[in-house]
Amino acid sequence: MLDITGDVAANIIEPNSEDVDLEGPHLENGRMIYASKTFENLDATRKAGLWGLSMPRRYGGLNLPNAIFSMASEIIAAADAGFQNIWSLQSCIDTLYEFGSEEQRQKYIPRICAGETMSMDLTEPDAGSDLQRVMLKATQDEDGTWRLNGV
């Protein structure tokens, strides 16, 4: 798995890093859109099976030790630290696995393991990195789009 991570990092993520920095994310119709090469990076990590490394197979994961995820994360960070921040959001899956209901696990963990979804809100003016003080609320529209409302 680490060889695969190294291959993706060296041959796709690192060569894309300058273009990602130059283009950057942007707003389009009120939605944040990643740089186009970021989407290439996400697609490459999905195709390589680099999502859900430490999750049980029954949820679509690879059931590898967290140490493997940590090493893979460092390899990706060496190629592009900004992209590593996006890719490593999947580590939030551990909280869902430990504290979510079985219904929540079945609903969300396979999608995260497939690299289809993941999000996190951490910083607000009065919260900083204190997650208990974050005021963000997420609501789902009828069309399935999530709306984030906070400070």
How does the language model describe each region?
Residues L62, E103-V151:
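Glycine-rich, Trp-frequent "lid" loop and neighboring beta-strands that shape
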Residues S70, I93-D94, Q106, W146:
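Feature representing long, continuous alpha-helical segments
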Residues M1-F83, E103, K107:
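Amphipathic, small/basic residue-rich leader segments at the start of a protein or domain
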Residues Q84-E102:
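N-terminal glycine-rich flavin-associated loop
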Residues T45-R46, S91-C92, Q140-D141:
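Short hydrophobic "helix-edge" motifs at membrane interfaces and signal-peptide entry regions
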Residues N29-K37, E98, G115-S119:
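Short, mixed-charge aromatic SLiMs
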Residues G49-G52, G82-N85, T117-S119, T145-W146:
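Beta-sheet entry/capping signal
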